[in-house]
Amino acid sequence: MKSDAVTKGIQQAPHRSLFNALGLTKEELDKPLIGIVSSYNEIVPGHMNLDKIVEAVKLGVAMAGGTPIVFPAIAVCDGIAMGHIGMKYSLVTRDLIADSTEAMAMAHSFDALVMVPNCDKNVPGLLMAAARVNIPTIFVSGGPMLAGRVHGEKRSLSSMFEAVGAHAAGKMTEEEVEEFENKVCPTCGSCSGMYTANSMNCLTEALGMGLKGNGTIPAVYSERIRLAKHAGMKIMELLQNNIRPRDIMSEKAFLNALAVDMALGCSTNSMLHLPAIAHEAGVDLNVDIANEISAKTPNLCHLAPAGHTYMEDLNEAGGVYAVMNELDKKGLLYTDLITCTGKTIKENIEGCVNRDPDTIRPIENPYSQTGGIAVLKGNLAPDSGVVKRSAVAPEMMVHVGPARVFDCEEDAIDAIKSGKIVAGDVVVIRYEGPKGGPGMREMLNPTSAIAGMGLGSSVALITDGRFSGASRGASIGHVSPEAAVGGNIALIEEGDIIKIDIPNNSLNFVVSDEELERRRVNWSPREPKITTGYLARYTAMVTSGNRGAILEVPRVK
């Protein structure tokens, strides 16, 4: 066993003395050491129940003959970090989580790992670590929040952000906003729509790294405690059979995940995280392939914010496996791949029927014949831009309008809320990319302000930043190259005509080559906004959004 390096032999007597200090017995040290990565904390609603999940995992590991040992991972609540400097520190934690988990796993010679994440950057960060360390690993998340109820209708956090915009437009009173505030987030768990956290937990299941129900069983259900116990037991099987993350997360597994992504209508953040996870697994996953998969993969779900169904509804309908079963009817998945169950995808999804065709459309009757996400290209986004097509109003799928240009999120929000943005405009928010932000902030506040003020079907927003999974509308993010490195988005001027054509995957602005070159000559890079601490190091190492904003050591010239 890998842990023999710290538990066996006379040379390891000092190591054993330290295990003795932990209260571990010789009998426990004779068993495999299973690291349980706990993301529990008291600041993230999606993580406040993870202590209970961890205890259940420990019981499962012990029942199956292992010795569970818990160590922590950090996690940020994107909702609490939203709209201020805190959002610069969200995406960057993905890589901190991957790095620190790698360090803990390698330093202590664990035989296997059980990852217990839940929210936005925590899930991909731990998937990246799993691929890097490549010892037997399984995931069990904390589960989604139940939807709130306001006046008898299901609501979620995206409704809350839009209520603030509606108040600014004079469409809601402060008392009505307060009612939303008190009711939209009724339980612990990851926010209740198909936002980033739930997207990544569902895609963990699709990749084969989580058991059935990992992405959809609500946080407050006792079924999730049982799932955690099963995950603890299952890791011992994976260890015995030496099934490792890179055996599971193959190139075909990532193509499966993209297909499920398109069917579910996941957050556009998946287009950042899947390439980054694939990179750690030794797989080159170019975002361009998303359009190829989208062209043949129907969109089957319109969960919030795209529609009025929620994660609890998806769970009742049969969950991720039911969606995969629908896709398999048209041969859209590779089903012979091994998963963390020790079985193939085909074996896993057999008999997992769609129990609610209103939540999961049958593949013969999809919301659209194409997937939920589109990658756009053109002179505005030479490398790529990403949009959640399933959350765009039909009248905005093709749009032409004047650019309203802002060099930071705050200036754009002020303009939107003060009524300076009108129907037909295209809001451009730049210098918010991975380097320029730094940290590629989510533009949920401006998109929610646009929707709340009744402009969601007439105003588009384009940014080199990114969007919360709770954003809806013609919200095009991840524009690459970003403004900070001289991408064309830096050269747009107020009033330039922008042409958006989502069905044809194009994003352009009307400018001659000569004029574009003139503007480029006059452009110069800006000084970094932050020059100390982790964000300064991140700025120096982070790559473009179209590459998943992975980190690379700068080459010495």
Swiss-Prot record:
The keyword Amino-acid biosynthesis is annotated on this UniProt entry: yes
Gene3D superfamilies reported for this sequence: IlvD/EDD C-terminal domain-like (3.50.30.80)
Annotated active site: S468 (proton acceptor)
Database matches in HAMAP family: IlvD
Keyword terms: 2Fe-2S, Amino-acid biosynthesis, Branched-chain amino acid biosynthesis, Iron, Iron-sulfur, Lyase, Magnesium, Metal-binding
Keyword Repeat: no
Entry's EC annotation: 4.2.1.9
Cofactor(s) needed for function: [2Fe-2S] cluster; Mg(2+)
Catalytic reaction equation(s): (2R)-2,3-dihydroxy-3-methylbutanoate = 3-methyl-2-oxobutanoate + H2O; (2R,3R)-2,3-dihydroxy-3-methylpentanoate = (S)-3-methyl-2-oxopentanoate + H2O
Listed name of the protein: Dihydroxy-acid dehydratase
InterPro entries: Dihydro-acid_dehy_C, DihydroxyA_deHydtase, DiOHA_6PGluconate_deHydtase_CS, ILV_EDD_C, ILV_EDD_N, IlvD/EDD_N
Annotated binding of Mg(2+), by residue: D78, D120, K121, E442
